[in-house]
Amino acid sequence: MKLPRLGTVSIIALTTALTLSACVPAPVGDGTGLSGTIIGAGASSQQAAQEAWVRGFQLANVQATIEYDPIGSGGGRDTFIGGGAVFAASDRAFSVEEIAEEDFVSCVPGTGILEIPAYISPIAIIFNVEGVDALNLDAATIAGIFTREIDQWDDAAIADQNPTVDLPDQRITAVHRADDSGTTANFTGYLSDTAPQVWDAGAIEKWPLEFGGEAALQTSGVVDAVTNGTGTIGYADASRAGQLGTVSVKVGDEYVPYSPEAAAAIVDVSPFGEGRGPTDFAVEIDRDSTEAGVYPVVLISYLIACNEYVSKDRVDVIRGYLEYVISPEGQQAAAASAGSAPISPRLFDQASAAVAAIR
């Protein structure tokens, strides 16, 4: 696939075309459908899913080209606001205040935006400690590690929850995102909701400098830093956890490992946000739920588009691509490539009506 064109917002210095996934089944279609090129940008957590979606959509629409730049959630939102991309991917939705204040260049003023939680995935707490593959940790301990209140792997707070694990006398290196990140916002949202006595910085996209730790750019940078370090721990979209050790988090009286099913379960018990438009399906995650089998460290990544575009050029491709992404075929393709959880039938019905109305 050719490299994406430069957007009108200066944050895009260099774009990266996605390598198409070979494992996605072709959707039904004869390949003679829509044509034209559209540009999207945003969350690096969606990269594997976007590869699957692009391949599946283009197999049915061979004259269409989808160019996606995984520059991060904040960059994607800024690029969409400025008109450098016709859709954005973000690990957090725009706030109600941002929607009211921003002038979305590509959108007809007053028509609002569409936000679909199209990618649901657990955030894995990953670590690299020799001889240890899995740990049980409660929220307060996780927060203590990332605020550096707990800085040794054999600290009693960790050891007491893992009595059968041989923990080393080794310093903990906590790795966080250096860039503005929706993954960070979701991870800190979990800490803020479940361990506010330890994590008092709130749900934020930019890591607080006072907590220190090692910084790394984007999802791949965090995974590389944890993989290549010693005694490291970090957080990343679960599709990128690989062979690293992972944490089961305490929910009620049980420790729950990450899984697509557990991520979907927490979304099902969570409401939509208040004060939003009819095509804005932002979810307020109930991270301190004690329901059995839910995994609260979850990332809901959104696809964001205009309800009505200023330019009618390529609107059919935009609508068609989003229709494929949320379809059962598209969601299955993402699940196969990225380990994400398919959206629920209720959300599919609501989102489908909104996407069909794009003009």
Can you say where each PLM-predicted feature lies in the sequence?
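Flexible, solvent-exposed loop/hinge segments that line or gate ligand/substrate-binding clefts
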Residues: 94, 200-328, 335-359
